[in-house]
Structures are given as C-alpha cells and as structure tokens.
C-alpha cells in the first residue's frame, strides 16, 4: 500500500520535499513538533529480493527501539536479518552491539531468533578468528562449551590416541 498517503499532511509534505520515493532500503526520518524522530519510513525490498534484506536497515538507524507498523512479508527472516546485520568481529577490542532494538513482529518466536543469531555469531567469530587466536585448543574449548550448554556428551581424540586411531 501507499504508506505516504496514510501519513499526516505535514509528513506527506516532508516526504515530498525530500524526494522520498521509497526505493528499496531507503530511509526517511520524520520529526515530531519537538524536532525528535517520530517515525522512519523505509522503502521495502521488492518481491523476490533477499528475505534478510530489510534487516540491513538496522545498521543505518540511530540508537533506539523500533517496531514495524506493517508486518513484513517474512517477519522471522526480517527479525533474524536485523540481528545478523549488527554483528561485528574484533577480538582485541570487544564491541558492544549497537543498541538498535527491534520489537519482534507479531507471530515471531523471539527466543528462536535469538538462538539462531547467537549460533551465527559463534560460527562467524570462529571463521573470522586468525589462527593464532583460535587454534585447536580454543576450538576444543568452544565445542566443549556448546556440548555442555546442551547436555551433550563430549570427547576428544588427540595426541598418541589420534595417531593410533586416525584412519
């Protein structure tokens, strides 16, 4: 739907003056009477675009809490994409994730999105880690931590035992 036509007249005038055409993943900040951001219009991705694409706006937004007024076509993927967009890797200077919070769209299992995002972050950390920071011992400890967190049994074959049992 044409969201601009549903906006209050001052917001419509502002959108027009800014030349906002709602191209995919473009943003338009609309201020309230005190000059504070009241809402942000976002150009939705086109049908068939990457289902995670809408999540890419998370890194373009100022710190704050956000919610979609219209439920996205794939709300689960948008919520996960939002989380994945905020990933940063820097083992020497741990960074805090930018506080751009999304209220989970209706019908989305928040806990599931968090588990998937955390799993992705863990894999990405290991892939991005230089070999001198993430060697066999660190890999073993990471695997041990995952096993422990999920109540799984864990064993390691190494050293002479590995030499003897390796195919």
What is each residue range found by the language model?
Residues 1-167:
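N-terminal hydrophobic/helix-forming segments and targeting peptides
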């Amino acid at each position: 739907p044409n969201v601009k036509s549903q906006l209050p007249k001052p917001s419509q005038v502002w959108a027009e003056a800014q030349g906002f055409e709602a191209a995919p993943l473009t943003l338009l900040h609309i201020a309230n009477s005190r000059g504070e951001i009241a809402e942000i219009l976002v150009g939705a991705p086109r049908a068939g675009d990457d289902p995670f694409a809408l999540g890419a706006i998370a890194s373009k937004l100022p710190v704050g809490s956000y919610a979609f007024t219209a439920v996205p076509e794939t709300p689960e993927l948008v919520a996960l994409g939002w989380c994945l967009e905020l990933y940063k890797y820097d083992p020497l200077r741990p960074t805090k994730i930018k506080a751009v919070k999304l209220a989970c769209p209706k019908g989305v299992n928040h806990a599931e999105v968090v588990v998937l995002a955390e799993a992705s972050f863990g894999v990405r950390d290991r892939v991005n880690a230089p070999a001198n920071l993430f060697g066999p011992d660190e890999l073993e400890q990471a695997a041990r931590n995952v096993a422990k967190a999920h109540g799984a049994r864990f064993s390691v074959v190494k050293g002479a035992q590995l030499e003897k049992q390796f195919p």
